Design a protein with these regions (language model features):
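Generic, well-ordered alpha-helical scaffold segments in large soluble proteins
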Residues: 35, 40, 44, 48, ...
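Short alpha-helical segments and helix-capping/turn motifs at coil-helix boundaries
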Residues: 33-44, 160-161, 185-191
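Thiamine diphosphate
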Residues: 61-62, 161-241
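Non-heme iron-sulfur electron-transfer modules
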Residues: 1-13
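N-terminal leader/propeptide and maturation segments of large enzyme subunits in energy/redox metabolism
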Residues: 86-161
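Conserved thiamine diphosphate
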Residues: 15-20, 24-28, 84-98, 103-119, ...
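Terminal amphipathic helices with adjacent charged low-complexity linkers/tails
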Residues: 1-2, 58-89
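N-terminal amphipathic, basic-rich helices that act as targeting or association modules
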Residues: 17, 23-55, 59-66
Length: 241
């Protein structure tokens, strides 16, 4: 297995497909092109992924009670998913990012204190590695595992204080999912606001060029001349750039 991983890096198209998908058996419409994109993203970032999902097809095949296609790996890590209103999903996802960043900043201060003033060398070494990779998602996960193990072995009061929020120690990959009806039309102002922030956040637009979940009505993403509901004679305006 390790030989394959070394030969085909996960940062390549082929190499990414040797990673476990953390989205499976979605129940989407036959031939739907949306789940494969989400599956690929979970292969790359799923074990540390937060998803803010705009109401639409992605919330129907993505988390219709009582089941969900999002799953966890053998370590129990997988995407954390939540659904928002159609009109404010970008802001909702941005809020998720700011909230977990605030918690991590608090944890960072505590780890810095342990590294500077602690007496347990294992905790200090693991803490320094965690601090060095604080903003690097690809390597911070492994550093977090080492830090958690060292803190659990230590058992001191400061360690227990940090471990109380251990789920927030690892650097997260924040994603915002939604369709073109959300991103081009109803939630466009929020998308613009979030992208303009320059923060470390990702937006995935499932652009079907119509309002898919409500039956195929035209959106600002629909191309000129396309026939859709509310555009039976062909859409008169061009696709929003």
């Amino acid at each position: 297995k390790q030989d394959v991983i070394d030969k085909f890096k996960e940062t390549t198209v082929k190499g990414s497909q040797f990673k476990q998908p953390l989205l499976e058996f979605s129940g989407a419409c036959a031939g739907c092109g949306e789940p494969p994109y989400a599956k690929l993203i979970t292969q790359l970032f799923g074990d540390r992924m937060y998803i803010a999902n705009a109401t639409g097809c992605t919330s129907i095949w993505g988390n219709s009670s009582p089941s969900t296609p999002y799953t966890a790996n053998k370590a129990g890590k997988g995407p954390a998913w939540s659904n928002s209103l159609f009109e404010d999903n970008a802001e909702f996802g941005y809020g998720m990012l700011l909230a977990q960043r605030a918690i991590r900043d608090g944890l960072k201060a505590k780890v810095e204190d342990v590294v500077a003033n602690g007496t347990n060398e294992d905790v200090k070494a693991a803490g320094q590695e965690w601090l060095d990779t604080f903003a690097v998602g690809a390597t911070n996960g492994a550093a977090t595992d080492k830090l958690v193990a060292a803190l659990e072995a230590c058992g001191c009061d400061k360690a227990k204080e940090i471990l109380a929020q251990k789920d927030f120690l690892a650097k997260k990959s924040q994603w915002i999912f939604g369709g073109d009806g959300w991103a081009y039309d109803i939630g466009f102002g929020g998308v613009d606001h979030v992208l303009a922030s320059g923060k470390d956040i990702n937006v995935m637009v499932f652009d079907t060029e119509v309002y898919s979940n409500t039956g195929g009505q035209s959106s600002k993403s629909t191309k000129t001349g396309a026939i859709a509901q509310f555009a039976a004679g062909g859409k008169e305006t061009k696709k929003k750039d």
